[in-house]
Amino acid sequence: MQGPGGNVSRGLPSGPASTVASGAGRCESGALMHSFGIFLQGLLGVVAFSTLMLKRFREPKHERRPWRIWFLDTSKQAIGMLFIHFANVYLADLTEEDPCSLYLINFLLDATVGMLLIYVGVRAVGVLVEWQQWESLRFGEYGDPLQCGAWVGQCALYIVIMIFEKSVVFIVLLILQWKKVALLNPIENPDLKLAIVMLIVPFFVNAFMFWVVDNFLMRKGKTKAKLEERGANQDSRNGSKVRYRRAASHEESESEILISADDEMEESDAEEDLRRPVKKKHRFGLPV
């Protein structure tokens, strides 16, 4: 009787001990949405989004966007990034592997392959919008006065681009079997794994992604060449020549200001009238 009793006493702790050992240092399924994980995600969102505010203040004063335009531009990107983030969290919990490692791999693929896909998508949409002359769907242009419908349409287009990007990245993840890669296995502390996956690595990568994607989505200033071409086409009918000057301040509505040939001739005539009395005084030896 002692034998069976001893066997039972030795067998009872062995099960729980092995369970604890197998789970030690592992990022369990659902850990990304636990309280600590949610706290890290919120902190990351605030810190990473603040880089867009820094970018705005670093823009030249005559090109700096008003706060309302800046908010409309960046809110589209924030919605797109939230979609990618929660898609990664959902996909990470679909596997029996370490969800923290799979989330990190997903995130790094979004920051490399995904960035290229976003750029291609934005350019393709831009070409389509120009071809169809959909004025309200040009990224960064919301009409004057601002139209909420323009923002909604652009936001919908950007979400379609993000769905395309995430679908391609997910296919790449499945084909290359990267879901079996355990990048964080050497780290034993699960909270440290969460901090690396949700805060440390994403902070630097998200700051770079926000900065670059904002350049994709913001309204580009009209170039001098485009304005000259447009002005030449307009004024060729009138037979007049035009020239352009750079805007001296942000208050002027366009970064390139058209000056008509008539205005330039009036300025030159006024200067010539001022020089004539001076020339006559020099001719007769009178003091100027």
From Swiss-Prot:
Required for localization in the endoplasmic reticulum: annotated segments: 241-246
Region (Disordered): 228-288
Intracellular or extracellular location(s): Endoplasmic reticulum membrane
Tissues with expression: Widely expressed.
Listed GO CC annotations: cortical endoplasmic reticulum; endoplasmic reticulum membrane; endoplasmic reticulum-plasma membrane contact site
Ranges of biased composition (kind: Basic residues): 277-288
GO biological process, alphabetically ordered: activation of store-operated calcium channel activity; store-operated calcium entry
Topological domains, Cytoplasmic: 1-28, 215-288
Biased composition (Acidic residues): 261-272
Entries under Pfam families matching the protein: STIMATE (PF12400)
Gene Ontology molecular function, alphabetical: calcium channel regulator activity
Motif GXXXG motif boundaries: 149-153
Subunit structure as annotated in this protein's UniProt entry: Homooligomer. Interacts with STIM1.
Protein name per the record: Store-operated calcium entry regulator STIMATE
Origin species: Mus musculus
